[in-house]
Amino acid sequence: MIKLTIDKAATSKGISSQKELRELIIEKTGVELRAATISDLYRNNKNQINREHLFTVMEALEITDFNEVLTIKRR
């Protein structure tokens, strides 16, 4: 099972809300992800992960290590 930990990664970078994360993404990457997309990533609500969305978030947070944004657990 893959679990996104974008909420923890954002908090560690001083981002305290999804709105702040969205603003940072726009500022750093120029990409306007929908608020619902960010919410799904933040809350780990998707069964599928869009790689481009994940890379965009990682770029905005200046993260290069996938271990900072996801964990893999055995069922």
Map each language-model feature to its residues.
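A short, Lys/Arg-rich alpha-helix, primarily the initiator
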Residues: 1-24
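DNA major-groove recognition helix of helix-turn-helix
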Residues: 10, 42-43, 53
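Helix-turn-helix DNA-binding elements, focusing on the entry/boundary residues of the two helices
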Residues: 17-18, 35, 54
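Residues within the alpha-helical elements of helix-turn-helix
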Residues: 24, 28, 60
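Recognition helix of helix-turn-helix/homeodomain-like DNA-binding domains
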Residues: 31-48
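DNA major-groove recognition helix of helix-turn-helix/homeodomain DNA-binding modules
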Residues: 51-68
